[in-house]
Amino acid sequence: MEFLKLILFLIIFYIIHNTYIKFKKINKNELKGPIPIPILGNLYQLTSGLPHRDLTKISEKYGGIYRFWFADLYTVVLSDPILIREMFVNNGDYFLDRPKIPSIRHATHYHGIATSSGEYWLKIRDIINKAMRKTNLKLIYDSLDQQVDNLIESMNKIESDGQVFEPRIYFKKYTMAAMYKFIFNEEINFNNEISELIGPIEQVFKDLGSGSLFDVLLISRPLYYQWIEHTDKNYPKILNFLKKKYHQHLKTYNPEIQRDLLDLLIKEYYSGSDDDILTIIATINDLFLAGTDTSSASLEYMVMMLVNYPEIQEKVYDEIKLTVNGRNKVLLSDRQFTPYTVSFIKETLRYKPPSSVGVPRTTSQDIIIGDKFIPKDAQIFINYYGLSRNQDYFENPEQFEPSRFMNPDTNIAFLPFSIGTRNCVGQNFALDEMFLAFSNIILNFKFSSIDGKQIDETELYGVTLRCKNKFNVSIKKRI
């Protein structure tokens, strides 16, 4: 009986203390936000199954910066581009770190480029930037051209056989092959075990994006970490594959010959220690996953937009056809002559951002942004979806209209790859691979709905915003 009383007392004490933490005033300029409840904080307000939309709706009341309790985590939600720049550009040194939560610890042990922090991350970033400069870009882009040819060849066969085209699977293979060449300097073979990674990669992004209450509930973190360590099957599949590739690569490594990104990482990091090996594997894991998933999801949305807006599809096709002037292939050098096509790609990235809220950051000290107080260790979210729907910067944001980007003035709210020191290191490569794939498939094929109806544009929440439902389209050869 006494034991039960003790348990009851501890529960009541925990609830009271938890409530006090959430309601205590921390500064006269503290952020406003919705009213939290004990334990859950404001999570009870994420009811639609699409948290990025719920957060956007809340911003209608509290503006482009507000406070939101993800259970025990004090979180700042941003959808104002001026404040985002003030944080990540003007005060970027205070917003470099990542939060330490069980799911990220399980995935990377805070190693690699995406989830590490502090001096360790600065060193990784410098090495990656150096690698980007030293990599044989001609070899990489020649391979990218070949991957485009392979994609067109597959689509030609689908069209000639009278089959429907499934964008998700073919774009996933295209982006995966591009990253594979960049990291390992190898052509991918989808008849082997690599094809078995497509499902786990999708699930990892879905799980990380949807999150878990136990990640943000401090009292549950130790047990939750142990639980996912013993139950998750997806990350181990991916990491075991990358470990195998790493050890195979090491056998043929020659410090005098730099074949690819992995060679450069080995040269900079390899000492034989377990920690350095983990750093290398975690880094190629980050680049492989991010470089595969976000670009393929964006290409999938581009096809959706072509089908749902056929008049826009024809405008893009007419511009590309005029630009190539009889050639049967679009080159990267043609991009400067295709402003409407580039605007279409930008509008797709705005309308359906590659990421919902991205990977959160944390503050390393108390700081004033604008006139608002941000406490140390606050979790920082950019709501990319809310940013893309900000009516102060985008007229009629719910409409898909590529012409909005035809204005040469850069829209400061267009930040699909984040901004500042910790922006996406592979954004230029991602834009190049998307342009080459998109421009060439539309030069070669006309896309249409298989049933005459528009494709459902609803997205599935995750680290990557992907179409909720896989869809097929009809393709008809143009040339």
UniProtKB/Swiss-Prot annotation:
SUPFAM superfamilies, per the entry: Cytochrome P450
Keyword line: Heme, Iron, Membrane, Metal-binding, Monooxygenase, Oxidoreductase, Transmembrane, Transmembrane helix
UniProt keyword Iron present: yes
Binding, heme: C424
Class of this enzyme: oxidoreductase
Residue spans crossing the bilayer: 1-21
Membrane topology: Single-pass membrane protein
Pfam families linked to this entry: p450
Domain of life: Eukaryota
A GO molecular-function annotation: iron ion binding
Protein name: Probable cytochrome P450 508A3
Organism: Dictyostelium discoideum
